[in-house]
């Protein structure tokens, strides 16, 4: 049995969260540590949750944004020691039951990244997510980085453009993202 616990940077396992984020996500798919810590401690719409075993040992992390009418999963990672055993499915399925719909997340395009991205998308599809038809670009986390072509996945109906605009503004600080040069 795995559980989640919302944490701040003062939690004794926060360094574990940072290390897992570094190993699970390339630099251009996560913000720098100082920005991440600031968001984690702000306790606004952003949440950082430690995934724990039944013995309270750290096993993963999920970061997400709770908006008025949807939830955006920004990062989800299970430690390699706990992967391929159904633990990620168990954790995410439990969260999906308690969160309001729609739920949105981004995933790499398999043709650009390879087999891992393909397996990741299959994982989300098994949980009921659908790939959205609209083209999607993830804004850069850092000045000077480029926009990343991604797939937008949704549990619920196809997201209106307003949801994408809200994610771009609240998460990435980009207003009028449709006008931005990619």
Residues of each region from the PLM?
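Active-site rim helix/loop that mediates acceptor-substrate recognition in acyltransferases
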Residues: 23-53
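Short hydrophobic/aromatic beta-strand or adjacent loop that forms the aromatic wall/cage
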Residues: 46, 147-152
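Conserved catalytic-core motifs of GNAT/GCN5-like acyltransferases
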Residues: 119-145
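Short amphipathic alpha-helix that is part of the acyltransferase structural core
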Residues: 1-34, 149-150, 162-182
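Conserved acetyl-CoA-binding loop-helix of GNAT-fold acetyltransferases
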Residues: 78, 84-98
């Amino acid at each position: 049995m795995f559980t989640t616990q919302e944490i701040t940077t003062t939690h004794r396992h926060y360094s574990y969260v940072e290390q897992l984020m570094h190993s699970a996500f390339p630099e251009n798919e996560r913000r720098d540590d100082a920005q991440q810590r600031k968001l984690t401690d702000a306790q606004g719409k952003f949440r950082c949750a430690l995934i724990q075993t039944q013995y309270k040992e750290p096993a993963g992390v999920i970061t997400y944004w709770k908006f008025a009418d949807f939830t955006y999963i920004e990062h989800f990672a299970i430690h390699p020691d706990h992967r391929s055993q159904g633990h990620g499915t168990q954790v995410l399925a439990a969260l999906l039951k308690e969160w309001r719909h729609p739920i949105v997340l981004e995933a790499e395009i398999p043709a650009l990244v390879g087999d891992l991205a393909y397996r990741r998308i299959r994982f989300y599809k098994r949980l009921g997510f659908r790939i959205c038809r609209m083209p999607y670009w993830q804004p850069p986390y850092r000045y000077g980085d480029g926009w990343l072509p991604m797939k937008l996945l949704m549990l619920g109906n196809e997201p209106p453009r307003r949801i994408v605009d809200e994610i771009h503004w609240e998460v990435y600080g980009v207003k009028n993202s449709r006008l931005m040069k990619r």
